[in-house]
Amino acid sequence: YAESWINVYSDWLKTFPYEEGTTFPEEGGKENDVDYQWKGLQVAERVISQIDIMTYFIQSKNFTPEWLSVFLTAFAKEVECIRLNYYKEGNILVTQAQAVAMAGILMPEFKNANEWLSEGSQKLGEQIDKQFLADGVHYEFDISYHVGAISDFYETYRVAQLNNKAGGFPAGYLEKLKLPAHFVMDITYPNYSVENFNDTRSSRLGKSVLIKNFKKYAEMFPDDQEIQWMASERQSGSTPTYLQKAYTNGGYYILRNKWDDQSMMMILKNNNNPNNKYHCQPDNGTFSLYK
């Protein structure tokens, strides 16, 4: 496997060379499809995955010192390419910042590692404030993107914590994810499923996935007994007592008659999205009834 990966990646590097310092047109520009492999998610996902790939293959006899040099040189180019070509906004920018921060945390041998961590963590802190509205709803109004955004923001912070580098993140970083976590709790049906509001892909958010995320939220906020209750499938923690919740910034209004597996729920969607952006659909007034 290691030899095959080295052969494939070596060929890829020769086929798609990157000249250091190259910048590309802004996202959505008319030349955006040129050099696509060096833009946006493509580079960020390579950086994140290559950290895992290196640790997986480095014990192989085929992972020679010569190849290590090639790999690390290419890795540094990838990170610096991201830094020169950040998106202005959106989930792709979050992944770019995540990749740069992860590189700084997990590849401390690089001379720019501290810069990578500082820059990446700062951008993640800025994006938490921009991507979650005042009531905690993600600005794309898509439940699956909402859950994914919490995960992206937290995973990078968690890796920093495990490596004693969380101090590089802005003050109050983790606490800003508490309202978003509670929104997931409030909009989840009694059978641990969610509705297909906007572009939500509810089939990807089944019971096991939601419980896994609630356990992650319980790890983030160990003193929050309501989240613990959701994470434990109602076996421990404290049952919420409120029966209605209005997310007035995000435009989700939730009613229920109780908090057990026999509960009835109604959710009304009335998102404030005047520019028809991203993953929100123009169907305000849609409601769902769970019984």
Descriptions of predicted regions:
Residues L133, V137-K291:
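Carbohydrate-active enzyme catalytic cores, enriched for enzymes
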Residues Y1-K178:
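Aromatic-lined, polymer-binding surfaces characteristic
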